[in-house]
Design a protein with these regions (language model features):
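Compact, glycine/acidic-enriched structural inserts
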Residues: 68-99
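Flexible inter-domain linker/hinge segments
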Residues: 142-182
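Intrinsically disordered, low-complexity, positively charged segments
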Residues: 7, 11-43
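Conserved small/polar residues in nucleotide/adenosyl-binding loops
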Residues: 191-192
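Hydrophobic or amphipathic alpha-helical targeting/insertion segments
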Residues: 100-146
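Short acidic-glycine loop/turn motifs at beta-strand connectors
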Residues: 57-61, 78
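Short, high-confidence coil segments that cap the C-terminus of an alpha-helix
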Residues: 19-20, 107, 182
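Extended, Lys/Arg-enriched charged tracts that mediate electrostatic binding to polyanionic substrates
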Residues: 182-188
Length: 192
């Protein structure tokens, strides 16, 4: 089966990086639920097309976690592959983080794409045992037909949608900065 071949290719790359497991989520750089094809590596490696799930590839097994919306779909799409399905939300089913901790010995190496996996998830795993995190994009190494990241143009929303022009907003921020004696303002968005 094609999926098993892809998993084996992933393991070969994991061997080059000397990692004991690699974690692949269904997210992009912004933790969006609906992602561009470039980020559908979990789908590429597992064959599971649901929008939510985590694939963990170990040296000796591959496991997929998904929620109740996709249990039946995942069973069908994983059939014939080596991937073991963990049905999130069912009694006694460990989370992928719990399973990684139960399976890997202390000082094991876990591969991740740190641009995608949440630091809070990694910190939760690291709080249980001492592991070495190895940051690399496994998908770039195994997914030859991977589409390029979209490269669209940005545009300015009209004032009727934003309430004020960006120039007015910047002017207001600069006024407050001056009043407070501040040199800069950091604007950030949280997706957690």
């Amino acid at each position: 089966m094609e999926i098993n071949k892809r998993i084996e290719e992933a393991r070969k790359v994991m061997g080059k990086y000397k990692v004991d497991a690699y974690i692949i989520t269904s997210s992009d750089y912004h933790q969006s639920e609906y992602i561009d094809d470039y980020f559908k590596g979990r789908e590429y490696l597992s064959g599971f097309t649901g929008s939510a799930g985590v694939l963990v590839i170990f040296k000796d097994e591959a496991c997929l976690w998904t929620d109740g919306r996709y249990h039946i779909q995942a069973e069908k799409q994983l059939k014939g592959s080596e991937i073991k399905l963990f049905k999130q939300g069912n009694l006694g089913v460990p989370t992928y983080k719990e399973y990684v901790v139960s399976k890997l010995a202390e000082n094991s190496k876990i591969g991740i794409d740190a641009k995608i996996l949440l630091s809070s998830d990694i910190n939760e795993i690291l709080s249980k045992k001492k592991y070495k995190i190895v940051d690399f994009d496994l998908l770039d190494k195994v997914w030859n037909e991977r589409k390029a990241l979209p490269n669209g143009k940005i545009f300015i929303l009209e004032d009727k949608y934003t309430g004020k022009s960006y120039k007015e907003k910047v002017k207001e921020i600069r006024k407050v900065l001056k009043e407070k004696g501040a040199n800069y303002n950091i604007i950030s968005v949280s997706y957690t």
